[in-house]
Each structure stands twice: as structure tokens, then as C-alpha cells.
């Protein structure tokens, strides 16, 4: 599933082909995604794109006619291709530009979304989102305070979008390993020093993943079709029964919150 670094990589990849250019039209081949594609998007003709930003795992396209909000879902990806590029299976959505290019959304599982709003501050899917992990707002004081009343597993706590956005399953595993913290540790037992270490490591891991173009495990590709290379640096995720890169103990896997969790029982004692 594309996580924050993959969406940031997508944002950087598509921006040069969209920002400042004109949308000639939007083609919707299958409106039935996770939420039905907003009908307003079919009315877009000769609309200028002003900017592109990201909120959590949502891609936001700022236009003269409001905001186009995209989410890649479980297996979605976007590519920049020429107008005459053949349409493939699962190509559900195109933003056709006036520069000979188009943004094409492909999603086999149809669990993504393309929505519209004229007011970002009132967009319902953003109401309960926590701070961006790479922002100054997300600091150790905030994380420590937020953890005080939480009896959930630390990994579940970090993946809660109301606490902080964008720390998905892959990166949560890597972050906890680097911090030497067991994924089942109860969040409210976190010390101030551990909160400081977590915040530092979250920022470090996500920044490095963005620099590497995200993580390609199955479905994600960068907008130019290249894979993300952070997968080559994964220390514990997907490495069950392989030796820990630090101590040689076999990596274990357990289910936490219906997600596979990988850890070293020696380096990450409960």
C-alpha cells in the first residue's frame, strides 16, 4: 500500500507536468472506486492547475475551479504519459493536459479515490488527521503527551492517523526496530527520551524513503515507471526468520491490529 513517502514521490514526479498547465478535460472510465468519483470533475474543461500539495496520503491538485483530491488506495498508481498512450486494463481516470501529457490513474483493486472540494478546510476526510510527521508541529512533547492515555500497542499508536499521519505499516516496523522498541509495548509507558528518539527516527526514515523514491514491494511505481529503492534498505519488514542485521537473532513476525509486524526479540525486548 502506498504510504507517505510514495505519495510524496508521486507529488514530486507529476508536479512538473501539471503545475501551471491547463486541464483540457478529465476522463472517468470507471467512477466506482472506494468512493464514487466526484461528478464535478467531469465538468473540468480548460482549467488551470495552480499548485500541487500533499496532506497525509492524499494528493491535492489546486485549480482555478477548486481542489482535486486523489488517494492511491491499496494498489493504485499514477503515471505521466502522452495523449496517445494506449489505455490498459484498470486505467480508470485521466487528467488530460494541454502540453501533450496526461496523468493516468491505474488501480486493480479500485480502492483509491478522486474527489473534489471547493474548500479544503471543510473537506470531511481531513477533519481528524493528526500533524504531518515532517512538520515542526510533530515533536517529542506532542508525541509524549498524546501517548499518556493510550493503552494500545505502540505500533498501532504510531499508525493512528489522528496521532500522526503517514506512518504506515512498512515504516512503523523499521522505525521501531531502529529505536529498539517492541511493537507491542503499551503506548502510555513511553518515556520522554523514547518519544524524542521516536520523533527523530520517524523523520529520518521517512526523509530517507522519500530520497529513495519510496518502497516498491508489489504495486507501487514512481510516475516515470521506475520502482522505489527503499525496499533494498528494509531491515526487518518482510524478513521473518532471517538474521537480525544487528545481533543475528531470527526476526519474528506477529499480527498486531490485523497487520504483519516484524521485530527482533533480542534487540526489541518487550
Swiss-Prot record:
CDD domains: EcFpg-like_N. SUPFAM superfamilies: Glucocorticoid receptor-like (DNA-binding domain), N-terminal domain of MutM-like DNA repair proteins, S13-like H2TH domain. Keywords: DNA damage, DNA repair, DNA-binding, Glycosidase, Hydrolase, Lyase, Metal-binding, Multifunctional enzyme, Zinc, Zinc-finger. GO terms for molecular function: 8-oxo-7,8-dihydroguanine DNA N-glycosylase activity; class I DNA-(apurinic or apyrimidinic site) endonuclease activity; damaged DNA binding; zinc ion binding. InterPro entries: DNA_glyclase/AP_lyase_DNA-bd (IPR015886), DNA_glyclase_Znf_dom_DNA_BS (IPR015887), Formamido-pyr_DNA_Glyclase (IPR020629), FPG_cat (IPR012319), MutM-like_N-ter (IPR035937), Ribosomal_uS13-like_H2TH (IPR010979), Znf_DNA_glyclase/AP_lyase (IPR000214), Znf_FPG/IleRS (IPR010663). It comes from the Bacteria. Gene3D superfamilies: 1.10.8.50, MutM-like, N-terminal. Its EC number is 3.2.2.23, 4.2.99.18. DNA binds at residues 90, 109, 150. One of its GO terms (biological process) is base-excision repair. The active site is at 2 (schiff-base intermediate with dna), 3 (proton donor), 57 (proton donor), 259 (proton donor). It catalyses: Hydrolysis of DNA containing ring-opened 7-methylguanine residues, releasing 2,6-diamino-4-hydroxy-5-(N-methyl)formamidopyrimidine; 2'-deoxyribonucleotide-(2'-deoxyribose 5'-phosphate)-2'-deoxyribonucleotide-DNA = a 3'-end 2'-deoxyribonucleotide-(2,3-dehydro-2,3-deoxyribose 5'-phosphate)-DNA + a 5'-end 5'-phospho-2'-deoxyribonucleoside-DNA + H(+). The keyword Metal-binding applies. A zinc finger (FPG-type) spans 235-269. Binds 1 zinc ion per subunit. Its cofactor is Zn(2+). It holds the Pfam family H2TH. Involved in base excision repair of DNA damaged by oxidation or by mutagenic agents. Acts as a DNA glycosylase that recognizes and removes damaged bases. Has a preference for oxidized purines, such as 7,8-dihydro-8-oxoguanine (8-oxoG). Has AP (apurinic/apyrimidinic) lyase activity and introduces nicks in the DNA strand. Cleaves the DNA backbone by beta-delta elimination to generate a single-strand break at the site of the removed base with both 3'- and 5'-phosphates. Belongs to the FPG family. PANTHER family: FORMAMIDOPYRIMIDINE-DNA GLYCOSYLASE (PTHR22993:SF9). Monomer. This is Formamidopyrimidine-DNA glycosylase.
Amino acid at each position: 500500500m502506498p504510504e507517505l513517502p510514495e505519495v510524496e514521490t508521486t507529488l514530486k514526479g507529476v508536479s512538473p507536468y501539471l503545475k501551471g498547465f491547463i486541464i483540457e478535460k478529465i476522463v472517468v472510465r470507471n467512477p466506482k472506486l472506494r468512493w464514487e468519483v466526484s461528478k464535478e470533475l467531469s465538468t473540468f474543461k480548460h482549467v488551470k492547475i495552480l499548485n500541487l500539495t500533499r496532506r497525509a496520503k492524499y494528493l491535492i491538485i489546486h485549480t482555478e475551479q477548486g481542489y482535486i483530491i486523489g488517494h492511491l488506495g491499496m494498489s493504485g498508481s499514477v503515471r505521466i504519459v502522452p495523449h496517445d498512450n494506449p489505455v490498459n486494463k484498470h486505467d480508470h481516470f485521466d487528467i488530460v493536459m494541454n502540453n501533450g501529457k496526461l496523468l493516468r490513474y491505474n488501480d486493480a483493486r479500485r480502492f483509491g479515490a478522486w474527489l473534489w472540494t471547493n474548500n479544503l478546510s471543510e473537506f470531511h476526510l481531513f477533519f481528524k488527521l493528526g500533524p504531518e510527521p515532517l512538520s515542526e508541529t510533530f515533536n517529542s512533547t506532542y508525541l509524549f503527551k498524546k501517548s499518556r492515555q493510550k493503552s494500545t500497542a505502540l505500533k498501532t499508536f504510531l499508525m493512528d492517523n489522528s496521532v500522526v499521519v503517514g506512518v504506515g505499516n512498512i515504516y512503523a516496523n523499521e522505525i521501531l526496530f531502529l529505536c529498539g522498541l517492541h511493537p507491542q509495548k503499551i503506548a502510555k509507558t513511553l518515556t520522554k527520551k523514547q518519544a524524542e528518539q521516536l520523533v527523530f527516527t520517524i523523520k529520518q526514515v521517512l526523509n530517507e524513503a522519500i530520497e529513495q523514491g519510496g518502497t516498491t514491494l508489489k504495486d507501487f511505481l514512481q510516475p516515470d515507471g521506475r520502482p522505489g529503492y527503499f525496499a533494498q534498505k528494509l531491515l526487518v519488514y518482510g524478513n521473518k526468520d532471517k538474521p537480525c542485521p544487528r545481533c543475528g537473532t531470527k526476526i519474528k513476525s506477529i499480527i498486531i491490529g490485523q497487520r504483519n509486524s516484524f521485530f527482533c526479540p533480542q534487540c526489541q525486548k518487550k
